């Protein structure tokens, strides 16, 4: 399992597929945002005076994230996206 550092968040992105005229078009290339499940969260970020600011998201949350941000990583057979918390636009309730 991946344990992110600082304000980084590990996401499992929901893959969407779209069919046009019998061809499958990957959804990630179509939308400005994508939906993902939070798998793991770093401890947060430190202020200039050393205080820890806890992240706003927690494992299990469903979030809306910008499409073209983050780093794709593999942990075994699983694919994840590691992003900074600032790239998460909203928590989906």
Curated annotation (Swiss-Prot):
Q: What does this protein do?
A: Together with the chaperonin GroEL, plays an essential role in assisting protein folding. The GroEL-GroES system forms a nano-cage that allows encapsulation of the non-native substrate proteins and provides a physical environment optimized to promote and accelerate protein folding. GroES binds to the apical surface of the GroEL ring, thereby capping the opening of the GroEL channel.
Subunit info? Heptamer of 7 subunits arranged in a ring. Interacts with the chaperonin GroEL.
List the GO biological process terms. chaperone cofactor-dependent protein refolding
The record's subcellular location field reads: Cytoplasm
Q: Which UniProt keywords apply?
A: Chaperone, Cytoplasm
* Entry GO MF terms: ATP binding; metal ion binding; protein folding chaperone; protein-folding chaperone binding; unfolded protein binding
- Say if the entry is tagged with keyword Chaperone: yes
The record's listing under PROSITE patterns reads: CHAPERONINS_CPN10
Q: Which organism is it from?
A: Streptococcus intermedius
- Entries under InterPro entries matching the protein: Chaperonin_GroES, Chaperonin_GroES_sf, Chaprnonin_Cpn10_CS, GroES-like_sf
Q: A Pfam family for this UniProt protein?
A: Cpn10
Q: Which domain of life is it from?
A: Bacteria
Signal peptide feature range: none
Q: Hey, which family's this protein in?
A: Belongs to the GroES chaperonin family.
Which GO cellular component terms, listed alphabetically, does the Swiss-Prot or TrEMBL entry include?
A: cytoplasm
Alphabetized PANTHER family for the sequence: 10 KDA HEAT SHOCK PROTEIN, CO-CHAPERONIN GROES
Query: Does the keyword Chaperone feature in the UniProt annotation?
Result: yes
The protein's name is Co-chaperonin GroES
